């Protein structure tokens, strides 16, 4: 489905009765083709969605709440457009379910169907809220650099590596990622962590490259995949992982992770801005 046909940017009727048809899938293939990604994919990973505004009724009509987390595999053929996701979650509000497990089962069934792959769903009940973590992304901050930046359209020419030097293993972070919704033009604010093994990557160039997304339009997942592919092509690291945490909009935050080597899934700790 084309993003222009999604609920984004259109007058909205908010349903309060459960309706799985509200989910609007968008194929990943189109955006991947634009940056030269085909089969097999040069990465694997997950999109972590956190939904903070989930509520339903129990069998006696009493409202229940939970925080839902969705783990969408990067190899799924589709993503779900975020406003349609919000409307879908809102449709639970006046619908009675026998249990939280029944809600989780419905979420897993519907979102898996929309994405075209098995999606893992976890619900955190109010009794578990105190266990939820908040932390910043680990790594050496690129934002410490005092530099000029004047390019705000994606420019991978900033990316360079010193292949005549000994390989290094580094984790770099920045809070200066900004991109824009391709349908509404609304800004998307994020932090990104880049871990790699290979020739040393020029830090100033990498930061200027991330800043160059400032006027770029793309969904969160697409931006992270572009970052991954541009670094892989320009700097040729042996190992590479890119993880972004975007600030919340409409009760949802989206946190894509891409890697080309086996490693544990990153934790789902919220950053301060989230």
Curated annotation (Swiss-Prot):
What Enzyme Commission number(s) appear in the record?
A: 1.7.1.13
Q: Which residues bind NADPH?
A: 82-83, 249-250
Q: What is its main location?
A: cytoplasm
This chain belongs to the protein called NADPH-dependent 7-cyano-7-deazaguanine reductase
Family membership noted in the UniProt record: Belongs to the GTP cyclohydrolase I family. QueF type 2 subfamily.
Q: Which reaction does it catalyse?
A: 7-aminomethyl-7-carbaguanine + 2 NADP(+) = 7-cyano-7-deazaguanine + 2 NADPH + 3 H(+)
Q: Which UniProt keywords apply?
A: Cytoplasm, NADP, Oxidoreductase, Queuosine biosynthesis
What task does this protein carry out?
Answer: Catalyzes the NADPH-dependent reduction of 7-cyano-7-deazaguanine (preQ0) to 7-aminomethyl-7-deazaguanine (preQ1).
Question: Which Pfam families does the entry link to?
Answer: QueF, QueF_N
Q: Which residues bind substrate?
A: 80-82, 220-221
Q: Where in the cell is it found?
A: Cytoplasm
The active site lies at 181, 188
PANTHER family tied to this protein: NADPH-DEPENDENT 7-CYANO-7-DEAZAGUANINE REDUCTASE
- Quaternary form? Homodimer.
């Amino acid at each position: 489905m084309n993003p222009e046909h999604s609920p984004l940017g259109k007058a909205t009727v908010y349903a309060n009765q459960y309706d799985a048809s509200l989910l609007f899938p968008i194929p990943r293939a189109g955006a991947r083709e634009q940056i030269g990604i085909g089969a097999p994919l040069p990465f694997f990973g997950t999109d972590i969605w956190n939904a903070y505004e989930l509520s339903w009724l129990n069998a006696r009509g009493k409202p229940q709440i939970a925080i839902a987390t969705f783990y969408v595999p990067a190899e799924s053929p589709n993503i779900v457009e975020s406003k349609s996701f919000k409307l879908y979650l809102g449709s639970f509000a006046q619908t009675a379910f026998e249990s939280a497990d029944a809600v989780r089962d419905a979420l897993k069934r519907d979102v898996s169907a929309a994405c075209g792959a098995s999606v893992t769903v976890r619900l955190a009940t109010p009794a578990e809220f105190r266990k939820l973590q908040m932390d910043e992304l680990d790594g050496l901050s690129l934002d410490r650099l005092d530099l000029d930046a004047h390019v705000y359209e994606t420019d991978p020419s900033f990316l360079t590596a010193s292949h005549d030097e000994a390989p290094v293993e580094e984790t770099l972070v920045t809070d200066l990622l900004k991109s824009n919704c391709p349908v509404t033009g609304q800004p998307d604010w994020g932090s990104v962590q880049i871990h790699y093994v290979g020739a040393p990557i020029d830090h100033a160039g990498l930061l200027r490259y991330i800043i160059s997304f400032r006027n770029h339009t793309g969904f969160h997942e697409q931006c992270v995949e572009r970052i991954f592919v541009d670094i892989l092509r320009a700097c040729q690291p042996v190992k590479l992982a890119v993880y972004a945490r975007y600030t919340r909009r409409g009760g949802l935050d989206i946190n894509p992770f891409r890697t080309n080597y086996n490693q544990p899934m990153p934790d789902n700790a919220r950053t301060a801005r989230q």
